[in-house]
From Swiss-Prot:
Zn(2+) binds at D175, N208, H291, H328. It is an enzyme of class 3 (hydrolase). Keywords: Glycoprotein, Hydrolase, Iron, Metal-binding, Secreted, Signal, Zinc. Homodimer. The active site is at H301 (proton donor). Disulfide bonds: none annotated. This is Purple acid phosphatase 18. Belongs to the metallophosphoesterase superfamily. Purple acid phosphatase family. Its EC number is 3.1.3.2. Its cofactor is Fe cation; Zn(2+). It is found in: Secreted.
Length: 437
């Protein structure tokens, strides 16, 4: 089975490998090995790969996997260790992928939950007790941001650094496990991130490594959609590949780079409907995540986002998006506020953060000279932290993984577009775009 899987990997996936090099005078550490996970048989009913995600107002979705197909999909929870005052009933699914058969994947929504509160929970009446902390109901709130994670030594370093920061929600703009058809790597990824993802909600969108389609045999995103169910139904979407959520004064939109996005697509129609409901008094900050960057001065993946940008950028600009996070390019880059290919004080800041630790290495070659809209760029592994201090100001910091120490390498204070007065200039433009058929 393993040999067959390796052959499938070789024949069906194409990896573009970029070696690392110094940005300016920084000397980069050497690449690290792919993590190895010894295969170990556990009790078939013990919950594995536990992670949580936001699931509508005051609710969380708890996801876990068991090998026992008869295990129930309920979660017991409460505010004291070992004392479970509440019970949430859920659903389960499973999938097949050639010779692989997944375990039973459970999804259970719990709540309503109090904000900024620790809850203790147990999955399916078996196994260890876990705990989670709900996000605050108001500012300040901190997001951890890292994309293109994979399962390498650098991934582990990134996760260790994220674990040290006091974040409330993790944002991941695509490329999670780098399973690339080898389905057991979804299982090992779930185990790798469980210590963090079972405690704080992880909100993710898809990247190219989640597609895993085999023509006429396996549809796209089968593994991703089965394992990482996001609140698409709660946000009025008909696809797990695009959705939105609100938390503590922030409206976050997760878009799909690998599903239809033209103005006649379901995604575009949903996006218009979602933006029409945004209340900037309740959620003064508006952020967007997707995988393929629109503003990218790295040599890697040039122009791959151009078509999506042509379709969606005018709508995002008219709506006053503050920040756009992307991945895909295995490096870090931050722009000025931009729109239509040039600096614009009323456009969003674009941040590429595809440097979480993937196995393909770093993309170190950049365009020279750099575009006028590019502020900071470096090919190093790391993560970002976005602290929304209040309704008007946010602090963004990028932390390089430097000799196992989380080095703060880039930071900037951001003023919300609501506070800057930009949105007062374009209400008619936005209404016109939202009303277009």
């Amino acid at each position: 089975m393993e040999k067959w899987g390796i052959l499938l990997l070789v024949t069906l996936s194409v990896s573009i490998i970029f070696t690392s090099a110094a940005a300016d005078d920084y000397v980069r550490p050497k690449p690290r090995e792919t993590l190895q996970f010894p295969w170990k048989q556990k009790s078939s009913s013990v919950p594995e790969q536990v992670h949580i995600s936001l699931a509508g107002d005051k609710h969380m979705r708890v996801t876990w996997v068991t090998n026992d197909k008869s295990s129930p999909s309920f979660v017991e929870y409460g505010t004291s260790p070992g004392k479970y005052s509440y019970l949430g009933q859920g659903e389960s699914t499973s999938y097949s992928y050639i010779m692989y058969r997944s375990g039973k994947i459970h999804h259970t929504v719990i709540g309503p939950l109090e904000a900024d509160t620790v809850y203790y929970y147990r999955c399916g009446g078996e196994g260890p007790e876990f705990h989670l902390k709900t996000p605050p109901a108001q500012f300040p709130i901190t997001f951890a941001v890292a994309g293109d994670l994979g399962q390498t030594g650098w991934t582990k370093s990134t996760l260790d650094h994220i674990d040290q920061c006091k974040y409330a929600v993790h944002l991941l703009p695509g490329d999670l496990s780098y399973a690339d058809y080898m389905q057991h790597k979804w299982d090992t990824f779930g185990e790798l991130v469980q210590p963090l993802a079972s405690v704080r909600p992880w909100m993710v969108t898809q990247g190219n490594h989640e597609k895993e389609s085999i023509p006429f045999i396996v549809d796209e995103f089968v593994s991703f959609n089965s394992r990482w169910k996001m609140p698409y139904e709660e946000s009025g979407s008909n696809s797990n590949l695009y959705y939105s959520f609100e938390v503590a004064g922030v409206h976050a939109i997760m878009l799909g780079s690998y599903t239809d996005y033209d103005r006649y697509s379901d995604q575009y129609s949903w996006l218009k409907a979602d933006l029409s409901k945004v209340d900037r008094e309740r959620t003064p900050w508006l952020i967007v995540l997707f995988h393929v960057p629109w503003y990218n001065s790295n040599n890697a993946h040039q122009h791959e986002g151009d078509e999506m940008m042509a379709e969606m950028e005018p709508l995002l600009y008219a709506s006053g998006v503050d920040i756009v996070f992307t991945g895909h390019v295995h490096a870090y880059e931050r722009t000025k506020r931009v729109n239509n290919g040039k600096s614009d004080p009323c456009g969003p800041v674009h941040i590429t953060i595809g440097d979480g630790g993937n196995r393909e290495g770093l993309a170190r070659k950049y365009k020279d000279p750099s575009p006028e809209w590019s502020v900071f760029r470096e090919a190093s592994f790391g993560h970002g932290e976005l602290q929304m201090v209040n309704s008007t100001h946010a602090l963004w910091t990028w932390h390089r993984n430097d000799d196992d120490e989380p080095t703060r390498s880039d930071e900037v204070w951001l003023n919300s577009l609501v506070n800057s007065g930009c949105l007062k200039k374009r209400p008619q433009e936005l209404r016109k775009m939202l009303l277009e058929p």
